[in-house]
Design a protein with these regions (language model features):
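N-terminal topogenic module of multi-pass integral membrane proteins
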Residues: 1-66
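Membrane-helix interface and helix-disruption motif detector
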Residues: 7-17, 60-74, 120-134, 172-179
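Hydrophobic, membrane-inserted alpha-helices
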Residues: 25-29, 139-146, 162-170
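Membrane-interfacial loop-to-transmembrane alpha-helix junctions, especially the N-terminal start
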Residues: 40-50, 99-106, 151-162
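Aromatic-anchored segments of alpha-helical transmembrane domains
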Residues: 51-59, 109-120, 162-174
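Membrane-helix boundary connector in multi-pass membrane proteins
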Residues: 63-66, 148-160, 167-179
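Membrane-proximal helix-loop-helix units in multi-pass membrane proteins
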Residues: 70-144
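Residue-level detector of conserved catalytic or cofactor/ligand-binding positions
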Residues: 179-185
């Protein structure tokens, strides 16, 4: 678990200004989709999603998570999601047509990337060794919220990849918690 938090600390120390800009761009583009869902706004959001998932793949996993086992696989995984968004940009498959049916759930999902840092603080963590808005979990819940908010027709491959990633991550957390519980205390 120490390697996990150390890699997060290194990532946050080196990229926190960029993470703030990426988060601000995401807020701006999401707001634009709600207020003025023009073709430009929709394409800009897809370009942002290509960038965001590419960032997780290259910067987060390849540059800062090298000490973790299997980081290449996760980098490829998030790279595939970036390519799926790129494909969507050129095909126009996901039209980002608003669906107000799940407003409450979407609100919760949009809030989660901002709650992760607060939960880290509540657990006694401090910057830079804490979760932030531009990390895999945050990006995954934001993406699910975005696709749910604009769910008239969505790219199911993106959803399938995110669900597979979530299952892998959940099982990893469960196994690590069992290891942590079974460690003898001194």
């Amino acid at each position: 678990m120490e390697i996990f938090w150390n890699t997060i600390a290194q990532y946050n120390e080196a990229t926190w200004w960029t993470q703030l800009l990426i988060t601000a761009a995401g807020i701006l583009l999401t707001t634009q989709l709600y207020r003025k869902p023009t073709l430009w706004a929709k394409r800009s959001m897809k370009i942002y999603m290509v960038f965001l998932n590419g960032w997780i793949s290259i910067v987060y996993y390849m540059m800062y998570c090298g000490a973790r086992g299997h980081h290449h696989i996760l980098a490829i995984f998030w790279g595939v999601i970036a390519v799926l968004w790129l494909w969507d940009l050129f095909t126009g498959y996901t039209p980002f047509e608003r669906n107000p049916k799940y407003k409450v759930l979407v609100g919760v999902l949009y809030a989660m990337p901002f709650l992760y840092p607060l939960l880290s603080w509540a657990r006694g963590m401090e910057f830079p060794m804490m979760t932030t808005t531009v990390m895999p979990c945050s990006v995954a819940v934001f993406t699910i919220g975005l696709l749910l908010a604009f769910s008239r027709r969505v790219n199911l491959l993106v959803i399938l990849f995110l669900c597979h990633w979530a299952l892998i991550a959940f099982s990893k957390v469960y196994i690590l918690s069992l290891i942590h519980i079974s460690e003898p205390t001194r």
